[in-house]
């Protein structure tokens, strides 16, 4: 049971004055010594609010005394002072962890020594803070980090700090998983220390494919989050076929992309038909009903599976070898699909797509993604548990991220911005954040923090200011470079524009329509430019977003003429993207909302929907995946005929549905 420790030395009294960070104080070793002594006292007495106030009020004059004309280099001289660096990182550390969470350790003798050491180390605090994300439980993360650090032998101290931070931020919440093919649906809970020891000890024994010590925490979260037991991962390290794979920057024999097709595809799992003949050296395959196992990596390799099994195997096996990897999924013309992605030795990701924003090698091997409308992938952030776009993963491969003159500088400017905010100086905060966006142009977090600051400024941030900000944002994400353009970020910029620019009363409806339609036209021009690669690279998902955004602007004109304009716009959007089933499906509801209540347009809508369906989607070509996808589409379409009180127009779809269902039943008997 934890007890309150006896503090032998007398704790320094809590002074009311701010800590001084002027030029003289920054060179005075006594100032740093005082801060360290006070910090230690706060660990025991928990008076963190007063400590934070003394820091934020003391740091602010030092920051404002610098010259704004120095731009992104504005605070570099300040950072040369260890005392200043300690004060600024401490301030943000206390703010983010919160005084309430820090008080939890007042009676925790296991964490207190670690916390005192950490609060005296600006570099380690900065490492931690730079990798924190919204939603992290930082109190729990610190408790986990202390446990990991305390487990290291003396000769290992400091060697695995990045691994410790990544593990702490992933395991700040209970980490558990269930195997997809386990009939018992048992959940396995992974212990943070056990997971840390697996990677630390195997790194020491040089059994991993990567040098864990050289990977950053934002990369290592894609390693320690393996949804497997340690026994499974130990099996992977010993499995002969996996041991033959090598991590490479390009396509070569036995590279890690081959982990995906190592799992034999079981079409009978999809159709319910009789099992195929097993490959040489494997046991005879059993029917689907008898093929369920506990779903371990070893069993998946033995039994085979479908794309989700291939993705899970490739991702988890890579992580077992210390390779950052992600299981990615998307929606295309043949339904949902899963593939995987992994980090190459050059710290860039092989996403299995054709996007090469950082001049990645052209000969990258595939990772299971189909060239059939799967240009957009999604995965789950292992640190927060939330779904994210694959572009957020690929952006971490920015070569500038590992350069101190870019992302580190930008983060330090963000730390300064938070001090300005704590002193109610929003303009100073915004200036710091804009310098930060110049230092790290492709940092999503920096741009979002700057946008949040503009929103906090309220009416002080007028439409022109927002327009200038978004212009810079689009330039940063290469709006004019067709080969390096980040379309997701352009969509995010449009979201801000809809909220803060297109609300300008000086803009006419025609001007707003022209601006909001621009992104839609950019994506459509891109599709035409790609030609043969259309289905492989076109971001149909963002075409839907752009079309919906344009439709919202047109819908503001509630006159009959306005409704007619909206109808024809959405009709063109549906026609322009008829080859991609998910896009067609995604536009239907907006199209219906545009015609609802107008019987003439409702009938036009139903006829147009049915016409495109018959022309583009009726023929499933005996492709079981396409059949199931079209079946799902019919289920989406049929209710619209009822809503428009035209059930007879939908009779053909009812007939097609019955036909596809019969064909799928036949496949089960083969």
Language-model regions: role of each:
Residues 22, 45, 53, 60-70, ...:
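Acidic, low-complexity protein-protein interaction segments
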Residues 301, 305-309, 624, 628:
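Soluble non-cytosolic domains of exported or imported proteins
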Residues 357-451, 455-458, 462-463, 467:
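Charged, amphipathic alpha-helical linkers/stalks
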Residues 430-670:
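Extended amphipathic alpha-helical coiled-coil/heptad-repeat regions
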């Amino acid at each position: 049971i934890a007890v309150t420790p006896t503090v032998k030395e007398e704790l320094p009294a809590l002074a009311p004055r701010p800590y001084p960070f002027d030029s003289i104080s920054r060179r005075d070793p006594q100032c740093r010594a005082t801060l360290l002594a006070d910090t230690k006292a706060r660990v025991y007495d928990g008076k963190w609010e007063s400590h934070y106030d003394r820091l934020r009020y003391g740091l602010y004059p030092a920051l404002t005394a610098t010259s704004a004309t120095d731009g992104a280099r504005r605070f570099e001289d300040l950072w040369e002072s260890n005392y200043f660096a300690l004060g600024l990182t401490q301030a943000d550390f206390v703010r983010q962890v919160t005084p309430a969470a820090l008080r939890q350790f007042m009676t925790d003798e296991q964490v207190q020594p670690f916390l005192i050491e950490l609060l005296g180390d600006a570099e380690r605090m900065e490492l931690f803070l730079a990798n924190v994300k919204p939603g992290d439980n930082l109190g729990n993360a610190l408790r986990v980090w202390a446990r990991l650090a305390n487990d290291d032998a003396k000769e290992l101290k400091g060697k695995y700090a990045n691994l410790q931070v990544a593990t702490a931020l992933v395991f700040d919440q209970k980490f558990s998983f269930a195997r997809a093919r386990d009939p018992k649906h048992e959940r396995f809970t992974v212990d943070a220390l056990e997971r840390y020891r697996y990677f630390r000890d195997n790194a020491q024994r040089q059994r991993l494919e990567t040098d864990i010590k050289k990977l950053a925490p934002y990369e290592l979260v894609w390693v320690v989050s393996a949804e497997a037991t340690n026994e499974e991962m130990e099996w992977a390290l010993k499995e002969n076929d996996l041991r033959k794979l090598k991590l490479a920057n390009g396509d070569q024999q036995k590279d890690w992309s081959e982990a995906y097709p190592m799992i034999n595809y079981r079409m009978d799992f999809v159709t319910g038909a009789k099992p195929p003949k097993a490959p040489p050296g494997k046991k005879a395959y059993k029917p689907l009903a008898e093929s369920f196992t506990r779903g371990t990596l070893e069993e998946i390799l033995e039994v085979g599976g479908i794309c989700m099994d291939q993705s899970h195997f490739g991702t988890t096996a890579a992580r077992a070898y210390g390779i950052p990897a992600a299981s990615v999924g998307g929606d295309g013309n043949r339904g949902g699909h899963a593939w995987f992605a992994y980090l190459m030795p050059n710290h860039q990701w092989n996403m299995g797509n054709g996007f090469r924003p950082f001049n990645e090698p052209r000969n990258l091997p595939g990772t299971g993604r189909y060239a059939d409308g799967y240009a957009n992938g999604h995965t789950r952030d292992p640190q927060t548990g939330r779904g994210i776009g694959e572009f957020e993963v690929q952006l971490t491969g920015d070569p500038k991220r590992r350069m101190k003159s870019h992302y580190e500088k930008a983060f330090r400017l963000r730390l300064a911005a938070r001090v300005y905010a704590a002193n109610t100086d929003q303009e100073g905060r915004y200036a710091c954040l804009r310098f930060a966006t110049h230092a790290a142009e492709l940092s999503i977090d920096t741009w979002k923090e700057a946008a949040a600051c503009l929103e906090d400024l309220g009416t002080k941030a007028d439409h022109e200011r927002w327009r200038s900000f978004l212009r810079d944002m689009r330039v940063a994400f290469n709006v004019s470079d067709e080969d390096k353009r980040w379309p997701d970020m352009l969509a995010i910029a449009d979201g801000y524009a809809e909220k803060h620019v297109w609300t300008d009363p000086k803009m006419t409806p025609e001007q707003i329509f022209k601006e909001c339609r621009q992104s839609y036209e950019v994506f459509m021009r891109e599709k035409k430019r790609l030609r043969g690669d259309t289905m492989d690279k076109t971001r149909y998902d963002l075409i839907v977003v752009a079309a919906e955004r344009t439709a919202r602007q047109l819908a503001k004109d509630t006159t009959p003429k306005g409704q007619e304009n909206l109808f024809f716009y959405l009709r063109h959007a549906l026609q322009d993207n008829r080859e991609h089933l998910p896009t067609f499906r995604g536009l239907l509801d907006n199209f219906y909302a545009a015609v609802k209540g107008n019987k003439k347009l409702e009938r036009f809508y139903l006829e147009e929907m049915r016409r495109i369906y018959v022309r583009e989607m009726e023929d499933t070509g005996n492709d079981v995946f396409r059949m199931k996808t079209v079946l799902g589409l019919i289920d989406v379409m049929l209710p619209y005929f009822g809503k428009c009180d035209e059930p007879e127009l939908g009779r053909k779809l009812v007939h097609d549905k019955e036909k596809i269902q019969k064909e799928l039943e036949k496949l089960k008997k083969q």
